[in-house]
Amino acid sequence: MNSKTQKLAALKRQCFSCKKCSIAQGDSRVTSPHVFGCGNVNASIVVVGQNPGYSETIIKKPFVGDAGKNFDGFLQTILSIERKYIYITNTIKCYTPGNRPPTDQEIAACKDFLKQEIEIVQPQVVITLGNYALQYFTKHSGITKCHGEMEHSEEFNIDVFPMYHPSPLNMNKPLTRQAAEEDFRKLKALLKGSVDKVSDITEDSGIGLEGLI
């Protein structure tokens, strides 16, 4: 087990014992609302969404629902990579009741977990999905104005590529889906093969770190 795996496993244990916000304290319709990131610990790409949905709290992995299927489709057909080569996580680690948007207090409570994930994995680029992840890294709001344009996050000292969230609500809108497809093509051109397909794939470690989806 490499040091990145050990660090992420320890961070996940901290996350699952967190009681910093009302959701983690029991203000949710699920017994365990926490969902930690998972994937390749040596990934060149880290994907960051908003927060886990209800189905993710059951499986305990991010992006396993329809949004995840949409995203996987874009990865495979446009970027020509599989999910096993990336690391996926969320800005908020808990399912919000009724899948409502997270509050500022909830975002603040989870901030250190995401920051540490990025520091441990050390990707070349972060793909943000939707407004909340965009705001976390860039302080900008309004994905319609910022999507598809690479920019640098000063706080994290990393390149960030904002994209529309691949939710069914978004992808069922022809213009939004077309924009998402164009953004993936633009990302592929910007990367120009610089993102590695690392071979050190992290499977389930047996100590609590989720393996691949």
Which residues does each predicted region cover?
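Active-site and ligand/interface coordination hotspots across diverse enzymes
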Residues: 1-66, 77, 156, 193, ...
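Glycine/proline-rich loop-helix segments at beta-alpha junctions forming the active-site rim
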Residues: 2-5, 26, 83-84, 91-213
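Short, flexible, glycine/charge-rich loop motifs used to bind or transfer phosphoryl groups or to couple energy/partner
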Residues: 34-38, 76-77, 116-117, 148-151
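N-terminal catalytic or cofactor-binding beta/alpha core of small enzyme domains
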Residues: 44, 86-88
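Short amphipathic alpha-helical segment that frequently serves as the phosphate-/nucleotide-binding helix
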Residues: 61-69, 177, 181
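The first long alpha-helix at the start of the GST-like C-terminal all-alpha domain
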Residues: 65-86
